[in-house]
C-alpha cells in the first residue's frame, strides 16, 4: 500500500474526537475524489481515505470520510440514500472501537 494511504488511515485513527463516517459498497469505478465531492455537500471534508489492495490495484470498496464537525457528519447520516456512479453506498458513523486500538482485519492489513 502507498505510504500516503497508511499515513491517511493513521491520521484518521489518531483523531478520535473527529466526526468520521465509514463508507462501504463504494463502486470500483469511483475514486477518493468522487467520494470527497459527494460528501462535500454536507460540509467541509477534512480527509477522505479509500485504501487500495496492492495485489489487485483496485480499492477495497470501503473508505473513511472525516468532517470538520459532528453536525456535518449528522447531515450526511440523515441523507436516506447516497449514490455514487449509480450505486447506492452505505454510510455509518465510525465506531470508536475501531479507532481505539481494536483494529478490524482490513485495518490490520492496511497498517502493515
Swiss-Prot record:
Keyword Transcription regulation set for record: yes
UniProt-listed InterPro entries: Nucleotide-bd_a/b_plait_sf, RBD_domain_sf, RRM_dom, SLIRP/GR-RBP-like, SLIRP_RRM
Gene Ontology CC annotation, any one: ribonucleoprotein complex
GO MF annotation list: RNA binding
This protein's UniProt keywords: Mitochondrion, Nucleus, Phosphoprotein, Repressor, RNA-binding, Transcription, Transcription regulation, Transit peptide
Residue pairs linked by disulfide bridges in the UniProt entry: none
Key word Transcription regulation present: yes
PROSITE patterns (alphabetical): RRM
Subcellular location per the Swiss-Prot or TrEMBL entry: Mitochondrion; Nucleus
One GO biological process term: spermatid development
Phosphoserine modifications at: 15, 105
Chain positions found as Phosphothreonine: 104
Residue intervals of the RRM domain: 19-98
Role played: RNA-binding protein that acts as a nuclear receptor corepressor. Probably acts by binding the SRA RNA, and repressing the SRA-mediated nuclear receptor coactivation. Binds the STR7 loop of SRA RNA. Also able to repress glucocorticoid (GR), androgen (AR), thyroid (TR) and VDR-mediated transactivation.
Entry-linked PANTHER family: HETEROGENEOUS NUCLEAR RIBONUCLEOPROTEIN 87F-RELATED (PTHR48027)
Protein name: SRA stem-loop-interacting RNA-binding protein, mitochondrial
Source organism: Mus musculus
Encoding gene per record: Slirp
Amino acid at each position: 500500500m502507498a505510504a500516503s494511504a497508511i499515513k491517511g488511515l493513521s491520521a484518521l485513527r489518531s483523531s478520535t474526537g473527529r466526526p468520521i463516517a465509514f463508507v462501504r459498497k463504494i463502486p470500483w469505478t469511483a475514486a477518493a475524489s468522487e467520494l470527497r465531492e459527494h460528501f462535500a455537500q454536507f460540509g467541509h471534508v477534512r480527509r477522505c481515505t479509500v485504501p487500495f489492495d496492492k495485489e489487485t490495484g483496485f480499492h477495497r470498496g470501503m473508505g473513511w470520510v472525516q468532517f470538520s464537525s459532528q453536525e456535518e457528519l449528522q447531515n450526511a447520516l440523515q441523507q436516506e440514500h447516497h449514490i455514487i456512479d449509480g450505486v447506492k453506498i452505505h454510510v455509518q458513523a465510525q465506531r470508536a472501537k475501531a479507532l481505539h486500538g481494536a483494529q478490524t482485519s482490513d485495518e490490520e492489513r492496511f497498517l502493515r
